[in-house]
UniProtKB/Swiss-Prot annotation:
One of the primary rRNA binding proteins, it binds directly to 16S rRNA where it nucleates assembly of the head domain of the 30S subunit. Is located at the subunit interface close to the decoding center, probably blocks exit of the E-site tRNA. The keyword rRNA processing does not apply. Pfam families: Ribosomal_S7 (PF00177). GO terms for cellular component: cytosolic small ribosomal subunit; ribosome. GO terms for molecular function: mRNA binding; rRNA binding; structural constituent of ribosome; tRNA binding. Keywords: Ribonucleoprotein, Ribosomal protein, RNA-binding, rRNA-binding, tRNA-binding. InterPro entries: Ribosomal_uS7 (IPR000235), Ribosomal_uS7_bac/org-type (IPR005717), Ribosomal_uS7_CS (IPR020606), Ribosomal_uS7_dom (IPR023798), Ribosomal_uS7_dom_sf (IPR036823). PROSITE patterns: RIBOSOMAL_S7. It comes from the Bacteria. Belongs to the universal ribosomal protein uS7 family. GO terms for biological process: ribosomal small subunit assembly; translation. This is Small ribosomal subunit protein uS7.
Length: 156
């Protein structure tokens, strides 16, 4: 166990265009090799595309997608007497959001398509409509937790 104190959580500054911390976090997840301006242009163009295709406010569609992707429970491995159990645990809100963003970006990259902008836009729209690979991942996580409900008393 570490003897040091807890690390202070640093606040995430909101993005300059939509003034949203959620978008700022997404830009950081999309960013590769420190190219933040490229990442932000990808995210903003994807949102513009979402706005065109849906005819709704792109930020609202994005927030709905993240809400749909956020898991409520997950399983964590816990070793008890030589056996490893998958113990279902509730997900804290900050971790749930982080997982949702991670899945959104990961499955956008894995998706077929020409540009990252179009792939991200399509994944956002799919998540808002409760379809797509990222939603499937959340459902799978919930199924795993449901299947291992018997080990819930091993919670720590």
């Amino acid at each position: 166990m570490s003897r040091r104190g807890n690390v202070k959580k640093r606040p995430v500054p909101p993005d300059p265009v939509y003034n949203s911390t959620l978008l700022s976090m997404t830009i950081r997840r999309v960013m590769r090799s420190g190219k933040k301006s490229l990442a932000s242009s990808i995210v903003y163009n994807a949102l513009a595309s979402v706005g065109e295709k849906t005819g709704e406010d792109p930020l609202e569609v994005f927030e709905k997608a993240i809400k749909n992707l956020t898991p409520l429970v997950e399983v964590k491995a816990r070793r008890v007497g030589g056996a490893t159990y998958q113990v279902p645990m509730e997900v804290r809100p900050a971790r749930g959001t982080a997982l949702a963003l991670r899945w959104l970006v990961h499955f956008s990259r894995a998706r077929g398509g020409r540009t990252m902008e179009s792939k991200l836009a399509n994944e956002i729209m799919d998540a808002a409509n409760e379809t797509g690979a990222a939603i499937k991942k959340r459902e799978e996580t919930h199924r795993m937790a449901e299947a291992n409900k018997a080990f819930a008393h091993y919670r720590y």
